[in-house]
């Protein structure tokens, strides 16, 4: 038994680290770049970089080659409801992070992107979204759903926000706002920071509702957006 250190914020020698979107192998004591994780679309954010570093370290310990490991990481399709890239419609990308049922989980989504349109809300946990206040500057606009809407509106204060109530209204409002900024790329991210039980049986049902609403928008806008629309596919 032996321990391989990993890190997402500093070089560890010997060890494996993912810093600034680059995966480094420092198992020999010298850090060698092995993969550009920024090109792995299913692995946004530093937390996914850390996951990739852990997977790489485990596979190297089992004797797999660097080439095989990196190929598997770069081709990884991601997990449903966990910062899942759902679709791109015109200039707007949609991400489903319905598994984020508390502020700590949504923190990873806010860290992963520079700017986003945030669909948030549901059955709030005790600390609500207070732990996310340092990252409110990343929010272009918040679209509030579920029982926590009024409470979160007060938390957001001067951050642009809209109480939408349900998923359909939130997805539609976020898309219309984002589409108006064409051709600049916009991100719409469902990362509720809440339990789902006020409106859904579980977080999977909530995420599936988001996916279905995005599919509906894709169908409705295909003719208007023409070549700018990427057809919807469920990942």
Language-model regions, residue ranges each:
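Nucleotide phosphate-binding/pyrophosphate-handling subdomain across enzymes
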Residues: 36-139
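Extended acidic/charged loop-beta regions that coordinate divalent cations
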Residues: 1-40, 75, 79-82, 86
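Hydrophobic, well-ordered secondary-structure elements that form the walls
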Residues: 83, 118, 142, 152, ...
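C-terminal helical cap/extension that packs against the catalytic core
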Residues: 129-187, 225-235
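Short glycine-rich anion-binding loops that position phosphate/pyrophosphate groups of nucleotides
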Residues: 9, 122-125, 148, 189, ...
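Glycine/aspartate-rich loop-and-adjacent alpha/beta segment that forms the canonical ThDP
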Residues: 193-219
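Short, hydrophobic beta-strand segments that form beta-sheet elements in well-ordered domains
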Residues: 2-7, 118, 141-147
């Amino acid at each position: 038994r032996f321990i391989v250190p990993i890190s997402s914020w500093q070089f560890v020698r010997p060890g494996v680290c993912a810093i600034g979107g680059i995966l480094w192998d420092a198992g020999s004591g010298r850090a060698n770049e092995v993969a550009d994780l920024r090109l792995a679309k299913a692995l946004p954010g530093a937390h996914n970089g850390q996951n990739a570093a852990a997977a790489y370290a485990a596979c190297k310990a089992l004797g797999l080659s660097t080439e095989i490991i990196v190929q598997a990481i770069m081709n990884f399709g991601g997990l449903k409801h966990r910062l899942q890239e759902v679709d791109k419609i015109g200039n707007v990308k949609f991400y489903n992070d319905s598994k984020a049922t508390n502020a700590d989980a949504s923190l990873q989504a806010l860290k992963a992107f520079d700017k986003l349109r945030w669909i948030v809300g549901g059955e709030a946990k005790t600390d609500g979204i207070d732990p996310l206040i340092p990252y409110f500057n990343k929010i272009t606009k918040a679209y509030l759903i579920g029982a926590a809407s009024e409470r979160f509106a007060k938390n957001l204060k001067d951050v642009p926000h809209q109480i939408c109530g349900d998923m359909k209204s939130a997805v539609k409002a976020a898309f219309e706002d984002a589409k108006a900024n064409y051709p600049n790329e916009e991100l719409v991210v469902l990362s509720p920071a809440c339990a789902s039980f006020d409106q859904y049986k579980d977080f999977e049902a909530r995420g599936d509702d988001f996916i279905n609403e995005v599919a509906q928008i894709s169908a409705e806008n295909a003719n208007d957006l023409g070549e700018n629309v990427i057809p919807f596919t469920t990942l």
